[in-house]
């Protein structure tokens, strides 16, 4: 189920994004990006609709994923 990220408090949203970024592992690109940069990137993706915040009833977890990969 998609959760409207706009309904979350800014602190809650930042904490969810930070947790997601930290779970994602190591960057293998040419330039290392800071945690703040990664959080800002994910926030931009949510704002643009490219990514969505998803609640899994089965696992009782929240995740962020590309909208094109989300299936009801």
UniProtKB/Swiss-Prot annotation:
InterPro entries: UPF0270, YehU-like_sf. SUPFAM superfamilies: YehU-like. It holds the Pfam family UPF0270. Belongs to the UPF0270 family. This is UPF0270 protein YheU. It comes from Salmonella arizonae (strain ATCC BAA-731 / CDC346-86 / RSK2980). The gene is yheU.
